[in-house]
Amino acid sequence: PLHWVFANLNASKDTIRILADLNKAYPFAETDAEKLEQKALGEINQDIIQRAIDCMSEGRVEDLGKLMNEAQEVFDKYVAPNCPSQLKSPKLHATLADPKILELTYGGKGVGSQGDGSIQFLAKNEECQKALVNYLNANNMPAYKLTIQPKHTIRKAIIPVAGFGTRLYPETRFLKKDFFPVVDKDNQVKPVILVLIEEC
């Protein structure tokens, strides 16, 4: 399971200013700093997202937490310099570096446009998740938890194909119901039995 914790830092930030400053890099970057911002929010971000998807699908929770830390480092290095008045984020960084929080989590990062608004963590387990929520609430940072359980995968499925398909009569006089052609989500015509198997 993924034991997430989200919290409001209860500090101030100006989202409109952040977005206005960061949007200066689009659609065409004019300075080196703007080019780095585009790279960070583009190809580097895409790479981190793909690795995060891989971590989740393979159950590598600790590595997912490290990716959160990496994403925050990339943001701080390449994006934050384009809006220093709002993205120095002292409370965010103090919270991310809190020794008590580091004991309870695999990683953490800011949320959305960043700044001293909200924060998210990946707790090590359910007990750490509860302790982290209590700790953040006690420090005037309202927190809530979200646990995502692993998806149950189907290893075996029974697909009944017996019977005459009376609701499809008279077509079933010429073609068994399990071989009826259907158009799948990719706009390919396949026998209905194949579509059922692919869905399993």
Locate predicted features.
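Conserved glycine-rich beta-strand-loop-beta hairpin in the small C-terminal domain of fold type I
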Residues: 117
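C-terminal nucleotide
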Residues: 1-110, 120-150
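N-terminal glycine-rich phosphate-binding loop and ensuing alpha1 helix
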Residues: 151-200
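Short, flexible coil/turn micro-motifs enriched in small/turn-prone residues
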Residues: 107-112, 158-160
